[in-house]
């Protein structure tokens, strides 16, 4: 009996440690990452990627909203999924819906031209040493760095590695 309780507690402790340091499961809510990700998909998120390395342009990430919480006690931060577009120190500008980094247009083959008719401009903004510019793939329906500003490195939870469910072609590869 005591052995079973200890085994259960050890398994629970291991699960908590893994979730806090290595891997997390997240669920997509909303249309901001369509067509890459869809509402209801379950994602495998690697926390380890950013413990061992730095975010790269094009990474699909889970982030915390700065200053937003899901509970009144401010214990659970609100999270969202976006794509890393701008890296620390870079200058980002949007002209007629096209993202420019350091004056050069960014190639974004993952965007759906029929869905993304967002043609507004955003004046150039240089990111700080610890800031990332994130956007949703569905620019017409995304609350992202255009609105909330750059995301500090500490707010990046991890990199989305795989869609766990539903099964099908993996939209994050290739």
Predicted feature residues:
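Protein maturation boundaries and topogenic segments
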Residues: 1-79, 151-174
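Mid-length scaffold segments of soluble, non-membrane domains
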Residues: 79-105
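PP2C/PPM family metal-dependent serine/threonine protein phosphatase catalytic domain
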Residues: 102-119
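Phosphate/adenylate-binding glycine loop and adjacent helical scaffold
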Residues: 136
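Active-site loop architecture of trypsin-fold serine endopeptidases
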Residues: 142-147
């Amino acid at each position: 009996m005591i052995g079973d309780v200890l085994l259960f507690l050890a398994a629970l402790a291991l699960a908590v440690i893994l979730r806090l340091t290595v891997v997390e499961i997240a669920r997509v809510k909303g249309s901001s990452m369509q067509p890459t990700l869809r509402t209801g998909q379950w994602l495998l998120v690697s926390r380890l990627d950013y413990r061992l390395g730095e975010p790269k342009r094009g990474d699909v990430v889970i982030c915390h909203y700065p200053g937003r919480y899901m509970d009144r006690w401010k214990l659970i931060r609100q999270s969202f999924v976006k794509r890393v577009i701008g890296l620390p120190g870079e200058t980002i500008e949007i002209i007629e819906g096209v993202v420019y980094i350091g004056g050069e247009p960014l190639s974004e083959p993952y965007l759906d031209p029929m869905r993304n008719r967002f043609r507004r401009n955003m004046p150039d903004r240089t990111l700080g040493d610890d800031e990332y510019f994130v956007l949703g793939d569905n620019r017409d329906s995304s609350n992202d760095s255009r609105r909330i500003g750059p995301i500090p490195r500490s707010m990046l939870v991890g990199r989305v590695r795989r869609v766990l469910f539903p099964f099908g072609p993996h939209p994050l590869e290739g």
